[in-house]
Amino acid sequence: MTNTRKNHPLMKIMNNSLIDLPAPSNISSWWNFGSLLGACLTLQVITGLFLAMHYTADTTTAFSSITHICRDVNYGWIIRYLHANGASMFFLCLFIHIGRGLYYGSFTLLETWNIGIILLFTVMATAFMGYVLPWGQMSFWGATVITNLLSAIPYIGINLVEWIWGGFSVDKATLTRFFAFHFILPFIIMALVMVHLLFLHETGSNNPLGIPSNSDKIPFHPYYTIKDFLGLLLLILLTVTLVLFSPDLLTDPDNYMPANPLNTPPHIKPEWYFLFAYAILRSIPNKLGGVLALFFSILILAIIPLLHTAKQQSMIFRPLSQYLFWILIANLFILTWIGGQPVEHPYTIIGQTASILYFSLILIIMPLVNLIENKMLKW
């Protein structure tokens, strides 16, 4: 069996990626989230496939087909809620995964980091289009508001929006194409994940100390397979608890009303995982400025390697940077809270302050503090 595992053309790839992969001996549980994201993606593809068997991408029957799935299909309700809450778990793991990359300086592995950013944009696009499919009030108005943002692009904006809509408003054509894209994108995500892992295995994983670990490697199996399995059990526990006890905790009640183009909901807001970006978008009074801020709030991750002025890769020995990192995390929590609040005083000013702080921390304050720490360490 050992010879087959190491010599068979297909099994050799699996073996070098999952079994005999040399891994640093000191990576902590923060490194579990890569495998958890793989588990989330698998869950989403499987549940999504079963949902697609019963879903109809038509404005007149989409909402009814979701009701049919929940009421008439065998265990349809659990498949639907696993898919909806699985997306929340996906983004939770995604944010922690990115946060770990920032804290421990994994962004210095440039190819892996950049593919990760492309993956983030693709997953966000997939989740947005998935949110439109139930064709409830928030689905319809969310699609209208977010696609309308493209009209801020000078000269081609209006034509671009109508081209995406397939008409003069969000309608049947929009729903059909969103379903088509929502179905195909997870497979593109899978391909990108393979590229992400390919680049990661070119350099090897980073570790909490941020120092080369070539002199002290251990095989991935059994050490990290067992460790990842524990993380997986905890994720399953959290997801199943959410699905069975409070499946609608993270959804919007407005989405249980069929889409009505003549009636606007009082507060249009996306799912919780987009609220931080939505708060940044709303904090700028100018439409084009808001769209650019929204886009750069995520694209800013791409320039973080250029802003890394510290001599040490990891933050583990840099207390000032750690302090700023946790301020950034707290700031993101504030932005998430503000994104779900109505546009009125004092939420507006809090959102604007948090947005300015978000960009200031990443672009100005953290690089300067890195330089100060270099001086303190006489580097």
UniProtKB/Swiss-Prot annotation:
Top-level taxonomic group: Eukaryota
Residues where a ubiquinone binds: 201
Subcellular localization: Mitochondrion inner membrane
Cofactors: heme b
Membrane topology listed for this record: Multi-pass membrane protein
Keywords (A to Z) from UniProt: Electron transport, Heme, Iron, Membrane, Metal-binding, Mitochondrion, Mitochondrion inner membrane, Respiratory chain, Transmembrane, Transmembrane helix, Transport, Ubiquinone
CDD domains: cytochrome_b_C, Cytochrome_b_N
Main location: mitochondrion
Residues annotated for heme b b562 binding in this entry: 83, 182
Residues at which heme b b566 binds: 97, 196
Pfam families: Cytochrom_B_C, Cytochrome_B
Cellular component GO terms held in the UniProt record: mitochondrial inner membrane; respiratory chain complex III
Protein family per UniProt: Belongs to the cytochrome b family.
Function: Component of the ubiquinol-cytochrome c reductase complex (complex III or cytochrome b-c1 complex) that is part of the mitochondrial respiratory chain. The b-c1 complex mediates electron transfer from ubiquinol to cytochrome c. Contributes to the generation of a proton gradient across the mitochondrial membrane that is then used for ATP synthesis.
Protein name (Swiss-Prot/TrEMBL): Cytochrome b
Species of the source: Varecia rubra (Red ruffed lemur)
